[in-house]
Amino acid sequence: MQERMAKNVIEISRTTKETDISLKLLVYGNGNAQIQSGIGFFDHMLQSLTKHSLIDLELACKGDTFIDGHHSVEDCGIVLGQGLAQGIYPAAGIERFGNASIVMDEACVECDIDVSNRAFLVFETNAYKLPFKGRVGELDVELVEEFFRALCFNAHLSAHIVLKRGKNLHHIIEAMFKAFGVSLRRALTLNPRILTPSTKGVL
């Protein structure tokens, strides 16, 4: 267990014609974050996810935000997911499952995570009576789902993010990132009684 917690910092660089991203990640950290994505509200959300998951994350992204934020947000999800996968698997000695229901004022979001080495995302916003669109700061609301999808599919984990109620988009999105962070922290909690959290014997 101590070896897993002392695992080296993961470093990833990813450059395309659309983005240039560098990442440093420690899965079992203290919630420290240094984020520069080029999109202020997205930085705030990543800081919140980091704080509540207790990972340590340094992420810098230079992207074509003069077009829009899509490439930067999605590619940050890809790189963060890749870093998590490197830090998590093989998934031995962890709880595997984590869930949280997080409130922010009128908004309430539930998140359930399975660190299963299988990728899936359920993203449900039916409780928001209007189309889940618009902008919060410089972030297009539709990109929130794109971020979580990229993260889950590259981290090889399954997540269900469900809005239970909410009206304010800022509150809703922040509750989503907090719920994901808390759920991830709980799923990655070390348990010396669990050798491999699967009847298959390997994850």
Curated annotation (Swiss-Prot):
Alphabetical list of InterPro entries matching this protein: IGPD_sf (IPR038494), ImidazoleglycerolP_deHydtase (IPR000807), ImidazoleglycerP_deHydtase_CS (IPR020565), Ribosomal_Su5_D2-typ_SF (IPR020568)
Record-listed E.C. numbers: 4.2.1.19
Catalysis performed (reactions): D-erythro-1-(imidazol-4-yl)glycerol 3-phosphate = 3-(imidazol-4-yl)-2-oxopropyl phosphate + H2O
GO BP field: L-histidine biosynthetic process
Source superkingdom: Bacteria
GO cellular component, one term: cytoplasm
Main localization category: cytoplasm
CDD domains named among the record's database cross-references: IGPD (cd07914)
Keyword tags: Amino-acid biosynthesis, Cytoplasm, Histidine biosynthesis, Lyase
Family affiliation: Belongs to the imidazoleglycerol-phosphate dehydratase family.
NCBIfam families for this protein: PRK00951.2-4
Matching PANTHER family: IMIDAZOLEGLYCEROL-PHOSPHATE DEHYDRATASE (PTHR23133:SF2), IMIDAZOLEGLYCEROL-PHOSPHATE DEHYDRATASE HIS7 (PTHR23133)
UniProt protein name: Imidazoleglycerol-phosphate dehydratase
Organism: Helicobacter hepaticus (strain ATCC 51449 / 3B1)
Source lineage: Bacteria, Pseudomonadati, Campylobacterota, Epsilonproteobacteria, Campylobacterales
